[in-house]
């Protein structure tokens, strides 16, 4: 009798997360929470998202359709779920953590053009699926510290049954075949709807979803049952029988009070113990020390603070997901609950409209964005807040709006950004030299911005240096425009201080007003929200929430700030209009 073929020995386990019935079931949060639980058990965990859309990355996608673009340390523009992964695992991931159909097809077609397939007919199977497998298995590589992951959690985007997802599901099936069933685990998320008229929970959608998954060769090892209430044991037993899943692997996940409660929900259902047992991983108790402290701060705040987020894309809160999470984490650092007021920037263009929109808030956050719509409203919100001592934090475009508002306050009444008004006589925000071809339409827009982590040097004793506790920092970026250095001296007449620059002093990274001019009005060209963690809040957000609490505790008495002399336009301010911008 021939010997059975042995699978290659591997120390790394693969856990695939799929979804059925409907989208937006919380696959990303489920995967992130399970990753957090396994990490708390002392395991090395990394994560990956497979997205079935044809875009190479989400960088050029409409934020109303896709939500935010999450930028990694190495400059990849990725899905917002990668942000969940980083926040729950408390570790940085690379661009390899997000794979799209567009990336896969681009690579395969490029190989075909180079003749690497030696005349083969290039097809979805095996060529596309092989490229997907290569990217999945590449996650097994050691990190910068030389540690290989114990577990790779791979979330497959889309819904089982979608045409777009089929190559990814087939690739996952083949990974299981290659690494061995004992090294692979499939977790399927499904909806159990509650029918109010009959007062029943329905299992049929889950049964059909699992049947569709099994029809392509994948039998789930565990099921996440999403519902607005607990699924009773008799129904769990029925689902286990009809879907051929162990009863220990049928997990009820009712809606939780906050996303940070989800690990506790999964642990209560013993999902992490079941995964450890099935994959033969080292069994250690969960260390809840750090997470329990987080949950105390989430559920037992000592104070409440109201922050206005003045944005262009507020109709879809996911467009500012990392900003919102960083604000909440800043509140955790101050033992405070942050109540967010979503304010459309168009509603703040005049003093009267800004006063109406921002009347009872304790702080104003101006997030990033692109395009001219709503810009005057962002500037109007900054003007209102500056006059009244209301704390402000500006991110990326927010810094640029702070600079424009400051320039206008000292007589450069037509000051603007070259992005919004290419013909402005005072382009206080100019196009970066290496971005001019992209802006002119002579180069690709996708993946060509100033992306990823860059260092900055802060002015000693500045507000930002005090917040960070150091003068050397690194933050992630995503922009094409910068402060025009030609106007630095003129803008400084407003009192605005350029408190942080690139190490060579050329690119403005941070601006602020000194405390004697305004208690907290700070802008950064970076996106610090991308490095915030619930258990390690970002210092800028913690400082901003702290300043907002100070404003609130002063009973919101609107104190008029020292008046900045308003310069009358006399034509002299345009003497620089023909000077070449050093930006």
UniProtKB/Swiss-Prot annotation:
List, alphabetically, the Pfam families matched: CTP_synth_N, GATase
* Record-annotated active site: 396 (nucleophile), 527, 529
What residues bind ATP, as annotated?
24-29, 81
Record bears the keyword Nucleotide-binding: yes
- What residues bind CTP, as annotated? 23, 162-164, 202-207, 238
Q: Which EC number(s) does the record attach to this protein?
A: 6.3.4.2
Print the keywords alphabetically.
ATP-binding, Glutamine amidotransferase, Ligase, Magnesium, Metal-binding, Nucleotide-binding, Pyrimidine biosynthesis
Gene Ontology molecular function: ATP binding; CTP synthase activity; glutaminase activity; identical protein binding; metal ion binding
Task: Give, as in the UniProt entry, the pathway in which the protein acts.
Answer: Pyrimidine metabolism; CTP biosynthesis via de novo pathway; CTP from UDP: step 2/2
Q: Describe how its activity is regulated.
A: Allosterically activated by GTP, when glutamine is the substrate; GTP has no effect on the reaction when ammonia is the substrate. The allosteric effector GTP functions by stabilizing the protein conformation that binds the tetrahedral intermediate(s) formed during glutamine hydrolysis. Inhibited by the product CTP, via allosteric rather than competitive inhibition.
**Which residues are listed for UTP binding in this entry?**
23, 202-207, 238
Family annotation (PANTHER family): CTP SYNTHASE, CTP SYNTHASE-RELATED
Q: Which family does it belong to?
A: Belongs to the CTP synthase family.
Subunit and partners? Homotetramer.
What role is this protein assigned? Catalyzes the ATP-dependent amination of UTP to CTP with either L-glutamine or ammonia as the source of nitrogen. Regulates intracellular CTP levels through interactions with the four ribonucleotide triphosphates.
Mind telling me what this protein is named? CTP synthase
